[in-house]
């Protein structure tokens, strides 16, 4: 194990210092997989690899790498965003505080594909870091992506919206749900596929959230779907009716 650690670190140092930017980038593309190699290692992940992932010098006493410059390179930023869940999973939720600021900076990255990658894995991050950290750090990200300037980012997050909400405490999930009807009628009024992404989750959310939905948001969303000008959404609204009655009857 120690030999493997040393060899990997030597290789990554050499590749990071290569004269070719393409070689450096190709090496960095492997960073998530290399870090994951240590998920069962009793000594944990070498700190040098974590620092490399964060855009810092591999040795703590070195100075040089500018994290701001590192993140402005969209290729590197996208690699970090894509590998974030795997790296946090390997390091464990107790190390989230170390990576949190880097994650937050990526959520406001200028390049849409970087934010889109984070939106795609938001529900996975919630499962990894747990409800408390999710409420503190990921709900603000979710709120931001609900209104992202890029429709694709919002659409990507909405694909797994139900999984994200079911990771939250009941009250936090209710607060998230409370925002959605207004978004349907304003931000998403001219984006039918965003409305469809929301509507698609309603049948699955009704059995788990309806009885705690004191504000009636799920009923409101069902009615909005039933009255939507898009036929596919009206069909989803129709599906919601028997599920709603069944849920009330069973409880």
Please describe what each predicted stretch is.
Residues 1-251:
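Extended, low-complexity, acidic/polar intrinsically disordered regions
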């Amino acid at each position: 194990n120690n030999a493997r650690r040393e060899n990997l670190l030597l290789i990554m140092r050499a590749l990071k210092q290569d004269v070719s930017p393409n070689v450096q980038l190709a090496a960095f593309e492997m960073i998530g997989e290399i870090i994951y190699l240590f998920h069962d290692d009793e000594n944990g992940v070498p700190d040098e690899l974590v620092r490399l992932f964060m855009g810092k010098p591999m040795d703590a006493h070195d100075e040089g790498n500018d994290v701001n410059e590192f993140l402005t390179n969209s290729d590197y930023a996208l690699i970090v965003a894509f590998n974030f869940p795997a790296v946090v999973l390997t390091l464990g939720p107790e190390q989230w505080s170390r990576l949190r600021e880097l994650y937050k900076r990526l959520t406001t990255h200028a390049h849409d594909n970087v934010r889109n990658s984070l939106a795609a894995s938001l529900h996975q991050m919630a499962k990894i870091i747990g409800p408390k950290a999710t409420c503190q750090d990921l709900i603000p990200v979710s709120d931001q992506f609900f209104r992202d300037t890029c429709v694709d980012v919002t659409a990507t997050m909405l694909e797994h919206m139900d999984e994200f909400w079911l990771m939250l405490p009941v009250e936090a999930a209710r607060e998230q749900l409370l925002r959605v009807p207004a978004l349907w009628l304003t931000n998403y009024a001219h984006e039918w596929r965003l409305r469809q992404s929301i509507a698609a989750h309603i049948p699955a959310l009704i059995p788990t959230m309806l009885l705690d939905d004191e504000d009636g948001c799920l009923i409101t969303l069902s009615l909005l779907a039933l009255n939507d000008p898009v036929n596919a959404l009206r069909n989803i609204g129709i599906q919601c009716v028997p599920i709603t009655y069944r849920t009330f009857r069973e409880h």
